[in-house]
């Protein structure tokens, strides 16, 4: 089922949680709402679910304005960050709950409920835990059971509010891949909230970046990462080095640098340039005409890569990320002088 929201406004006192938000969510897509705390992503999810009401604007499900439709009638499945499983019920009973509390005329037979629950537990690969209680499960298992419970009532839309936020990093990574595979099997329209950039980039078909209640950018993960429309989007989507300087006909000149760096810019004047740590190449001093003079401040091994912290002569602190072969070839020590050469630079007007 496709979802459309039009001109949504929602305030909590003086705070604008949603400020004229309009979006289309095509049927069958897995869409991430990404942004910092307080950006409006959870409020938007709750308005779509019917758990909050917008001050103005429309929510359209299957072509119908559902402003006057309650949460229960919207046929939406909702999964919270903190599982919300019933502690006194077994896994089986938790998943069956939504089916058993349906109105009598809509309620399946007990045999049909049993079959449905076992089907869903098999889908989330936890059928063997049917008679366990939530206290006997790991965090990752509880969240998969919560998802099975949401799917039991066959929702038209699945809404996930930071579903993996309470889990440790290793389990989160495993469940991200599992959620993507599950979505590919079910093709149910899904919107999930996250502040984890890596999670959004890995799992989603499309990303909606929100900031201060407004939509900053919408697009595929690759498009949003490679072509950010604002400095906020660039910085939020991953580690970034920031350089202040000026754009002129020769390119971008960082404060304190002698040489311009070639950039693609449609403006001139004060600017802020960004470069990812993995796009910062390190070379011997004066080895490159275009580059930033810097000294090594710290070297941090990170498993398969090495992070090198640099003190630029212009005063900025920069980070470069090298693979271990490049690091060994450079034989860097703290205090060494070098030239940092940006391979891919994005510039935005200074504000």
UniProtKB/Swiss-Prot annotation:
Family matches, as SUPFAM superfamilies: MOP-like (SSF50331), P-loop containing nucleoside triphosphate hydrolases (SSF52540)
Keyword Cell membrane: yes
Membrane topology of the entry: Peripheral membrane protein
InterPro entries listed in its UniProt record: AAA+_ATPase, ABC_SmlMolc_Importer, ABC_transporter-like_ATP-bd, ABC_transporter-like_CS, Mo/tungstate-bd_C_term_dom, P-loop_NTPase, Sulph_transpt1, TOBE-like
Compartment(s): Cell inner membrane
Domain ABC transporter: 3-237
CDD domains: ABC_CysA_sulfate_importer
Amino-acid positions noted as binding ATP in the UniProt annotation, renumbered to this chain: 35-42
Sorted UniProt keywords: ATP-binding, Cell inner membrane, Cell membrane, Membrane, Nucleotide-binding, Sulfate transport, Translocase, Transport
Top-level division of the source organism's lineage: Bacteria
Major localization listed first in the record, in broad terms: membrane
Family: Belongs to the ABC transporter superfamily. Sulfate/tungstate importer (TC 3.A.1.6) family.
Protein's job: Part of the ABC transporter complex CysAWTP involved in sulfate/thiosulfate import. Responsible for energy coupling to the transport system.
Protein name according to UniProt: Sulfate/thiosulfate import ATP-binding protein CysA
Provenance organism: Burkholderia mallei (strain ATCC 23344)
């Amino acid at each position: 089922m496709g979802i459309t929201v039009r001109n949504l406004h929602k305030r909590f006192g003086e705070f604008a949680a949603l400020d004229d938000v309009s979006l289309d969510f095509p049927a069958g897509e897995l869409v991430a709402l990404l942004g910092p705390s307080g950006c409006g992503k959870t409020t938007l999810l709750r308005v779509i679910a019917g758990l909050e009401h917008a001050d103005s604007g429309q929510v359209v499900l299957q072509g119908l304005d559902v402003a006057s439709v309650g949460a229960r009638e919207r046929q939406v499945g909702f999964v919270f960050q903190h599982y919300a499983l019933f502690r006194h019920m077994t896994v089986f009973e938790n998943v069956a709950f939504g089916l058993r509390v349906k109105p009598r005329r809509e309620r399946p037979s007990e045999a049909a409920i049993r079959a449905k629950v076992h089907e869903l537990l098999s889908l989330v690969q936890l059928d063997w835990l049917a008679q366990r209680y939530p206290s006997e499960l790991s965090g990752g298992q509880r969240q998969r059971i919560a998802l099975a419970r949401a799917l039991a009532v066959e929702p038209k839309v699945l809404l996930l509010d930071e579903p993996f936020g309470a889990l440790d990093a290793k389990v989160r990574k495993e469940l991200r891949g599992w959620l993507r595979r599950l979505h590919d099997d079910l093709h149910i329209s899904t919107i999930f909230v996250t502040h984890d950039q890596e999670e959004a980039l890995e799992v989603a078909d499309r990303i909606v970046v929100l900031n201060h209640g407004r939509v900053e950018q919408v697009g595929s993960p690759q498009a949003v990462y490679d072509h950010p429309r604002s400095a906020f989007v660039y910085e939020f989507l991953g580690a970034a080095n920031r350089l202040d300087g000026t754009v002129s006909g020769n390119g971008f000149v960082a404060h304190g640098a002698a040489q311009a760096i070639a950039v693609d810019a449609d403006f001139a004047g004060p600017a802020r340039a960004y470069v990812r740590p993995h796009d910062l190449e390190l070379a011997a001093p004066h080895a490159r005409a275009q580059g930033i003079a810097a000294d090594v401040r710290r070297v941090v091994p990170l498993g398969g890569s090495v992070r090198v912290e640099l003190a630029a002569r212009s005063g900025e602190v920069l980070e470069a990320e090298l693979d271990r072969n490049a690091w060994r070839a450079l034989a860097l020590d703290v205090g060494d002088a070098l030239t940092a050469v940006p391979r891919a630079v994005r510039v935005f007007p200074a504000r």
